[in-house]
Amino acid sequence: MIQPQTRLKVADNTGAKEIMCIRLEGGSNRKFSNVGDVIVASVKSATPGGVVKKGEVVKAVIVRTKKGIARKDGTYIRFDDNAAVIIRDDKQPRGTRIFGPVARELREKDFMKIISLAPEVL
């Protein structure tokens, strides 16, 4: 469950290390977002020479959350951190590598490029 002011790790090689959610896409009264949802975020820390700079406003898709995700078969999956991948307006990732596992729910939301770049899909 990600809400505004939540800080997330960045799971790609765009140069950003940490982002902070400032807006949830999908309605003006929306309170929370989960895996596969797009958020608007501000870059809070970045490495020098990266694609994105500190203070830049970016769109990102959530790939991991600490809050468990209930699946249709009755199982739950939960990760150790909250993480996101920075994307362009056409839902393609800005980076060329993805770090760490991502949830299978991204496949249902048509983030196929992120699924193919990820080292592990859970």
Curated annotation (Swiss-Prot):
PANTHER family hit by this protein: 50S/60S RIBOSOMAL PROTEIN L14/L23, LARGE RIBOSOMAL SUBUNIT PROTEIN UL14M
HAMAP family (UniProt xref): Ribosomal_uL14
Keywords, ordered alphabetically: Ribonucleoprotein, Ribosomal protein, RNA-binding, rRNA-binding
Pfam families listed in its UniProt record: Ribosomal_L14
NCBIfam families: rplN_bact
Subunit-structure text: Part of the 50S ribosomal subunit. Forms a cluster with proteins L3 and L19. In the 70S ribosome, L14 and L19 interact and together make contacts with the 16S rRNA in bridges B5 and B8.
GO molecular function, one term: structural constituent of ribosome
Example of a GO biological process term: translation
Family: Belongs to the universal ribosomal protein uL14 family.
Protein name: Large ribosomal subunit protein uL14
GO cellular component assignments: cytosolic large ribosomal subunit
Gene giving rise to this polypeptide: rplN
Function, as annotated: Binds to 23S rRNA. Forms part of two intersubunit bridges in the 70S ribosome.
Top-level taxon of origin: Bacteria
